[in-house]
């Protein structure tokens, strides 16, 4: 019997995660909670500017979505504690509103009757962070609340894992070249970050990211060794992580590429993809790998190495989120 799933927050990640979960034979999405009108939720699920039309049928009633003939109840509650998760048998909740990112907030779903909660964002406080392929061996049956980290941490961590295990990382710095998101202005307008206040579709915008430091949550041996920043660019989706590291010994670009290829074909298969093709960002839109390693960019000088990993910050991340839900189901 399929495990019953609810999604709290039906935005970009919520909808794309739904697209993955609806294809699973292990889980069943039975409820969605979002304050948006149901007809709008149906429209945004059916049509997607970045990822195309939904491969199936989408209709709606006043209080439900009907997807491929299956009715999914839609709630509109601000406080997750008021949701009837226990009554309808929900076991795992995808928390993708962006608001309930600590134990207190995520715990509201437990109070409402759910057994486990998966967060689609970096967590605040003492919540276990899991990056599939990197530290998912730490998952236990006792884990009731876990974070899927960020899309960038999911891209960066597999590369860092391979580099550290094979050659040893002494220190490093990354630039996250990231597609614009809803936390930017499409025209110049006030924002708490003066750079993000500028028009997203016509500017390259430097801003902060915690992704590099967050790697230490899944690879604790790298604590204090990595830092970085983000450069938001005018693409709707499709991003890249440019990582420069000092290793414990001198290496060649060929050694680095060989290590990445071995990992991509072995323990990180399905998470890390290796390519020697001269690709660009549009080539990886819709790709569900966490990281597409671009061997043609690799360079090395002594123990100083630069590598590049592409990722669809929406499709890849939501695929991992769905995988993590299935692991907990």
Language model regions located:
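Generic secondary-structure signature for well-ordered alpha-helical cores
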Residues: 22-26, 161-169, 179-182, 209, ...
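Acidic, glycine-rich segments within the central catalytic cores of soluble metabolic enzymes
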Residues: 165-236
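Generic structural signal for well-ordered, non-membrane alpha-helical segments
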Residues: 10, 14, 102, 149-152, ...
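Glycine-rich beta-alpha junction loops
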Residues: 35-38, 80, 123-124, 150-152, ...
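N-terminal Rossmann-like NAD(P) cofactor-binding subdomain of oxidoreductases
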Residues: 1-197, 299, 321-323, 327
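Short clusters of hydrophobic/aromatic residues that line enzyme substrate/ligand-binding pockets
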Residues: 65, 130-132, 145, 187, ...
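Short, solvent-exposed beta-strand edge segments and adjacent coil->beta transition regions
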Residues: 142-143, 199-201, 238-242, 304-306
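C-terminal active-site/capping subdomain that shapes the small-molecule cofactor and substrate pocket
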Residues: 228, 240, 244-329
């Amino acid at each position: 019997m399929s495990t019953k799933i609810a999604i709290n927050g039906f935005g970009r990640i919520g909808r794309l995660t739904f697209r993955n979960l609806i294809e699973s034979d292990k889980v069943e999405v039975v409820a969605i909670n979002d304050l948006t009108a149901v007809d709008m939720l149906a429209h945004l699920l059916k049509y997607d500017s970045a990822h195309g039309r939904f491969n199936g049928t989408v209709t709606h009633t006043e209080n439900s979505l009907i997807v491929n003939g299956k009715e999914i109840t839609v709630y509109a509650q601000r406080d997750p504690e008021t949701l009837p998760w226990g009554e309808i048998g929900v076991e795992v909740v995808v928390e993708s509103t962006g608001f309930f990112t600590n134990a207190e907030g995520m715990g509201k779903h437990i109070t409402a009757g759910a057994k486990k909660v998966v967060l689609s964002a970096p967590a605040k406080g003492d919540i276990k962070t899991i990056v599939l392929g990197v530290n998912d061996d730490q998952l236990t049956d006792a884990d009731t609340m876990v974070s899927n980290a960020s899309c960038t941490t999911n891209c960066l961590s597999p590369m860092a894992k391979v580099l550290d295990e094979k050659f040893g990382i002494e220190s490093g710095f990354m630039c996250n070249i990231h597609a614009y998101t809803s936390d930017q202005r499409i025209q110049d307008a006030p924002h708490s970050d003066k750079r993000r206040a500028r028009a997203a579709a016509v500017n390259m915008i430097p801003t902060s990211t915690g992704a590099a430091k967050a790697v230490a949550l899944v690879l604790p041996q790298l604590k204090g060794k990595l830092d970085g920043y983000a450069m938001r660019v005018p693409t709707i989706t499709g991003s890249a992580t440019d990582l420069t590291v000092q290793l414990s010994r001198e290496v060649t670009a060929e050694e680095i590429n060989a290590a990445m290829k071995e990992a991509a074909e072995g323990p990180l298969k399905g998470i890390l993809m290796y390519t020697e093709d001269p690709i660009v960002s549009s080539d990886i839109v819709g790709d569900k790998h966490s990281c597409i390693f671009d061997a043609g960019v690799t360079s090395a000088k002594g123990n100083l190495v630069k590598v590049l990993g592409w990722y669809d910050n929406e499709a890849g991340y939501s695929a991992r989120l769905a995988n993590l839900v299935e692991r907990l189901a």
